[in-house]
Amino acid sequence: MSQLTFRNADENDVGLILEFIRKLADYEKRLDEVVATEDDIRKWVFEKHQAEVIFALEDDKVIGFALFFLSFSTYLGNVNLHLEDLFIEPEYRGNGYGKAMLKKLAKIVVDRGYGRFEWTCLSWNKPSIDFYLSLGAKQKDWNVFHLTGRELEKLANE
């Protein structure tokens, strides 16, 4: 019987992390937006400690990952764990591994005393939305906005 385990990523995993980021972006039909490099991952995750990565392993084979970071809730007066990326290899889906990864992250939130566990999901991704709702997650009436590239530079330099 297969056993799912987890391990924290280390600096030797930057290539694997970037590979999973690209796989997720491809699934989301946004691969052309990925400009991150191994050096970026090394710098922000392992040198500046701005994010953490956990791998899911089936019988010692890495089959998925989660990348997360902290945000702050002024309403709660506490930090939130923000899940940026979650990806399970397609051939391993349907085995409860996505739920197990979310359970692992929820335990981190509880054990570390954080205030909330949050993430975003593309509006077209109905299978994931239905899955999250089945876990008791609530959709909030928020819109996510991004400023990058020229628009960011323009605002910064007006």
Regions found by a protein language model. Give the residues of each.
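Conserved acetyl-CoA pyrophosphate-binding loop and the N-cap/start of the following alpha-helix
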Residues: 92, 96-104
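Conserved active-site alpha-helix within GNAT-family acetyltransferase domains
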Residues: 99, 123-141, 147
